[in-house]
């Protein structure tokens, strides 16, 4: 949908922002709740469809505001029920959103940026450079689009989307304000009413923003670890050179402590053949995380062209898992979903208009991890 010049896009406004908007046009604040319900509960993008809003106000809204989500380029459905949407954002780039059904739970994986500046060596999103931050409307718009696609009207009844993970393209903490606003809308009863424990933000480790996070929102936290020591993580996740593991894990523990509840950090660990999948790496990981309340998601690498990495054997994956399991950690191995529509872990596709490497376009890849309440193995740490 093309932007209308000078009009306010209501899709990305939080409740306080929506109330300020209605103040600014001389209307009462209760109108904010009315309009938000139409937008998020019923997926409406036409003011004339808002039957409990008077005609005069509808005409005023049409003159000064719009409800505009990202443009849906394509929607694919896998044989296992996984869905993938390619959406075009205002920068001209396309990003992807993936829905993973599992029993009564449905998890939506949402992107926060077009491209990424972190340049993780096993992720081709980083190879294409950073293009743009998504607006709050473009972030929450992915939930809005998916919800409408499922016909979940109102959004809070018999919902298809029970969990949202900020694990798509980009580093969410480098688009802090827009991601925070979108997550508030995910949890707001006037938005999508999703429990705070079912909204997960995944980060590669932007320490100052992890410390800032607890001041603004209470959601589950996942850490893209991928290596058990600084030397290896410096190679795989270059931001580690700025924020090494000790500093990073301390910031994660500060975040969890600040929430004042017993929380568990989700650790994401992509297994790369002969790189970080040896038993010695598992032993290092046990030592590194021994004092961190956490659960561990092991993600076997899904190769993409020219990645330079391979998926470990099933035996290697099982040995690594068993080593952690025997040390008392909750450990799961990610099951490949949506492979036939390129929606599996490490297969997300997005055409990004690259401002930092204009001569190349790459298939965008960002690991897709489980939602915050993914069932765990029987082992429990004491």
UniProtKB/Swiss-Prot annotation:
The keyword DNA damage does not apply. Disulfide bonds join 109-345. GO terms for biological process: rRNA base methylation; tRNA methylation. Its EC number is 2.1.1.192. It catalyses: adenosine(2503) in 23S rRNA + 2 reduced [2Fe-2S]-[ferredoxin] + 2 S-adenosyl-L-methionine = 2-methyladenosine(2503) in 23S rRNA + 5'-deoxyadenosine + L-methionine + 2 oxidized [2Fe-2S]-[ferredoxin] + S-adenosyl-L-homocysteine; adenosine(37) in tRNA + 2 reduced [2Fe-2S]-[ferredoxin] + 2 S-adenosyl-L-methionine = 2-methyladenosine(37) in tRNA + 5'-deoxyadenosine + L-methionine + 2 oxidized [2Fe-2S]-[ferredoxin] + S-adenosyl-L-homocysteine. Binds 1 [4Fe-4S] cluster. The cluster is coordinated with 3 cysteines and an exchangeable S-adenosyl-L-methionine. GO terms for cellular component: cytoplasm. [4Fe-4S] cluster binds at residues 116, 120, 123. CDD domains: Radical_SAM (cd01335). This is Dual-specificity RNA methyltransferase RlmN. It comes from Pseudomonas fluorescens (strain ATCC BAA-477 / NRRL B-23932 / Pf-5). The gene is rlmN.
């Amino acid at each position: 949908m093309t932007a209308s010049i000078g009009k306010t896009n209501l899709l990305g406004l939080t409740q306080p922002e929506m109330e300020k908007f209605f103040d600014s046009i001389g209307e009462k604040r209760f109108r904010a709740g009315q309009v938000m319900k139409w937008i998020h509960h019923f997926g409406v993008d036409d003011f004339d469809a808002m039957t409990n809003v008077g005609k005069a106000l509808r005409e005023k809204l049409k003159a000064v505001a719009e409800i505009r989500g990202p443009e849906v380029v394509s929607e694919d459905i896998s044989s296992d029920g996984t869905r993938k949407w390619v959406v075009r954002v205002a920068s001209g780039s396309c990003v992807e959103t993936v829905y993973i059904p599992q029993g009564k739970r449905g998890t939506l994986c949402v992107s926060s940026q077009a491209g990424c500046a972190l340049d993780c060596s096993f992720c081709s999103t980083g190879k294409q450079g950073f293009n743009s931050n998504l607006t709050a409307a473009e972030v929450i718009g992915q939930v809005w689009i998916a919800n409408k696609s499922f016909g979940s009207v109102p959004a809070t009844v018999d919902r298809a989307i029970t969990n949202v993970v900020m694990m798509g393209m980009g580093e969410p903490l480098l688009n802090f304000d827009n991601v925070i606003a979108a997550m508030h809308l995910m949890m707001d009863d006037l938005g999508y009413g999703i429990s705070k424990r079912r909204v997960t933000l995944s980060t590669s480790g932007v320490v100052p923003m992890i410390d800032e996070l607890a001041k603004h929102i209470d959601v589950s936290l996942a850490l893209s670890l991928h290596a058990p020591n600084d030397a290896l993580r410096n190679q795989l996740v270059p931001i580690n050179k700025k924020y090494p593991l000790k500093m990073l894990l301390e910031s994660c523990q500060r975040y969890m402590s600040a929430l004042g509840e017993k929380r568990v950090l989700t650790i994401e660990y992509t297994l790369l053949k002969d790189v970080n999948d040896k038993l010695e790496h598992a032993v290092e990981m046990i030592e590194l995380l021994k004092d961190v309340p956490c659960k561990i998601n092991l993600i076997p690498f899904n190769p993409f062209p020219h990645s330079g990495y391979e998926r470990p054997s099933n035996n290697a994956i099982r040995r690594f898992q068993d080593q952690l399991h025997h040390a008392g950690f909750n450990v799961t191995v990610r099951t490949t979903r949506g492979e036939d529509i390129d929606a599996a872990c490490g297969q997300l596709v997005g055409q990004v208009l690259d401002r930092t490497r204009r001569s190349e376009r790459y298939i965008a890849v960002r690991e897709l991890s489980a939602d915050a309440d993914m069932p765990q193995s029987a082992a429990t740490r004491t």
